[in-house]
C-alpha cells in the first residue's frame, strides 16, 4: 500500500490521480479479502470517499480499473473503509470498554473531531456532523469529563493545504481553538487525526 493519498493535497488539484491511487489501496485490501481500518481522519476521508465514488459511479470504476490493470490489479467497488474510533464505539461498545477500566481518569478533556471524520456527512453518516457524540462518550466512559467549548467543530487550522500554503493563517486558527478550549478548562486534547495532532503540538511549541 501507499499514501491514501492525502485528500487536501492531491485531490484538490488532480482528482483522477487521487482516485487511482486510492483505488490501488482499496484493490490491495480486496485482494486479501479484508476491509480497511484506519487510525487517521485524512486516510479515512480519502479512502472512504474514493470507495463511495467507485461504488456508485460505474464509469469512474471502469476508468480506474483500466489504470489498475497495468499493475496487475482490479477493483470491484466493494471494499469497506472504517475509522478505528467508529469501530471501538459501534463494534466493541461502551460497556465493553468500561468493563476494562481499572483506574478511572479524573481530568477535563477537550475533544477535537477533525474535518474528515464526519464530513462530507451526506455520505459518511457516522454521527451528527454538528453535534457529534462518539468521541465524547468514549472519553467519558474512561471517567474523564468531555467539556464543551466555543467553536468545537472548527478545523484545527492545517487542513486543505492551509498549513503549507498559508502557515500564518493556519497558526491563527489553531491559536483561536487552543484559547477556546483552555478557557473552558481543558487539561488535555483528544484527537483522532495525526495531522490535527501535529498541528496542535507544533503550534503550542511555536
Predicted segments — roles?
Residues 1-206:
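Iron-sulfur cluster-binding electron-transfer modules in prokaryotic oxidoreductases
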Amino acid at each position: 500500500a501507499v499514501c491514501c493519498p492525502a485528500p487536501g493535497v492531491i485531490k484538490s488539484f488532480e482528482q483522477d490521480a487521487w482516485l487511482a491511487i486510492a483505488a490501488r489501496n482499496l484493490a490491495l485490501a480486496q485482494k486479501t479479502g479484508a476491509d480497511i481500518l484506519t487510525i487517521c481522519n485524512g486516510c479515512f476521508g480519502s479512502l472512504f470517499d474514493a470507495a463511495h465514488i467507485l461504488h456508485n459511479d460505474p464509469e469512474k470504476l471502469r476508468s480506474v480499473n483500466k489504470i489498475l490493470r497495468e499493475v496487475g490489479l482490479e477493483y470491484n467497488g466493494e471494499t469497506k473503509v472504517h475509522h478505528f474510533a467508529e469501530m471501538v464505539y459501534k463494534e466493541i461498545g461502551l460497556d465493553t470498554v468500561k468493563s476494562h477500566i481499572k483506574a478511572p481518569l479524573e481530568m477535563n478533556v477537550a475533544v477535537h473531531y477533525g474535518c474528515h471524520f464526519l464530513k462530507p456527512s451526506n455520505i459518511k453518516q457516522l454521527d451528527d456532523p454538528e453535534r457529534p457524540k462518539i468521541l465524547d462518550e468514549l472519553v467519558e466512559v474512561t471517567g474523564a469529563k468531555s467539556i464543551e467549548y466555543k467553536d468545537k467543530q472548527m478545523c484545527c487550522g492545517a487542513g486543505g493545504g492551509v498549513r503549507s500554503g498559508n502557515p500564518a493563517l493556519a497558526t491563527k486558527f489553531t491559536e483561536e481553538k487552543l484559547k477556546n478550549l483552555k478557557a473552558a478548562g481543558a487539561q488535555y486534547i483528544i484527537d483522532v487525526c495525526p495531522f490535527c495532532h501535529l498541528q496542535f503540538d507544533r503550534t503550542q511549541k511555536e
